[in-house]
């Protein structure tokens, strides 16, 4: 498979609800790839992945790290079980063997968390103590914000009717709509939509219904 949306200087908006599931090398594991740079199976890739009940993926290393957000169901490996809302950060040098009993859907970023000195984290974002309010109508759950690394990763929860101030994406911004609907001056984005905004772009988002977002910033700079 050739590279897909590899030019990170260009904006991308993809509604994954309109995509067909593609088979992976593992039986019962399906994917919708959103961006790909390099080798089809070992390159840098962002995707939505679905595991059928009782299926798994062979044990594998993470030479450049992996990020996994459980969207629904229960994801598992030899270290534990991770229900919907769990965010796992696996740095360079980590290894696991994924499986699921009842099926699950994941948002996965492979080869985008490189560095042996990065922390390994498994965070249950259902924990109310992890959320903090930044302004009226917006709460965030910080998942990664460490000195020495350009990117920040968080979940952002917007209450119905919330307007986000106009802002410039210094270092770029990536958003996946986990639930609800987000809008800005360019369009409307329902659950399952993935967006990548390049360094220096800007927008003024809002939500009428409320929404939950995965947000990664600062990783798309030159």
Stretches found by the model and what they are:
Residues 1-41, 103, 107-152:
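A short, N-terminal "cap"/entry segment at the start of jelly-roll beta-barrel domains
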Residues 29, 81, 92-117, 199-222:
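Ligand-binding loop in jelly-roll beta-barrel domains
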Residues 52-55, 62-77, 169-185, 191:
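Glycine- and acidic-residue-biased ligand/ion/polar-headgroup-sensing regions
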Residues 58-62, 79-80, 98-99, 164-169, ...:
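Short histidine-centered beta-strand/loop micro-motifs
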Residues 76-95, 184-203:
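Short acidic-glycine-tyrosine-enriched beta hairpin
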Residues 139-193, 208:
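Acidic/His-leaning functional-site neighborhoods
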């Amino acid at each position: 498979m050739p590279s897909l949306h590899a030019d990170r200087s260009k904006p991308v908006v993809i509604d994954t609800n309109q995509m067909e599931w593609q088979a992976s090398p593992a039986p019962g594991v399906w994917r919708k790839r959103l961006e790909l740079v390099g080798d089809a199976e070992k390159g840098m890739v962002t995707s939505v992945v679905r595991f059928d009940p009782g299926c798994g993926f062979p044990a594998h290393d993470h030479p450049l790290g992996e990020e996994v957000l459980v969207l629904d169901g229960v994801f598992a490996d030899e270290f534990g079980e991770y229900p919907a809302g769990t965010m796992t950060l696996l740095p360079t040098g980590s290894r696991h063997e994924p499986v699921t009993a009842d099926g699950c859907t994941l948002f996965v970023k492979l080869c985008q968390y490189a560095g042996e000195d990065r922390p390994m984290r498994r965070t249950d974002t259902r924990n109310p103590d992890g959320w903090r309010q930044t302004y009226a109508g917006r709460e965030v759950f910080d998942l990664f914000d460490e000195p020495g690394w350009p990117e920040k990763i968080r979940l952002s929860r917007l209450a119905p009717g919330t307007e986000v101030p106009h802002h410039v994406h210094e270092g770029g911004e990536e958003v996946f709509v986990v639930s609800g609907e987000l809008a800005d001056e360019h369009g409307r984005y329902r659950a399952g939509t993935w967006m990548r905004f390049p360094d220096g772009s800007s927008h003024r988002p809002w939500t009428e219904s409320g929404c939950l977002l995965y947000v990664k910033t600062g990783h798309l700079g030159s």
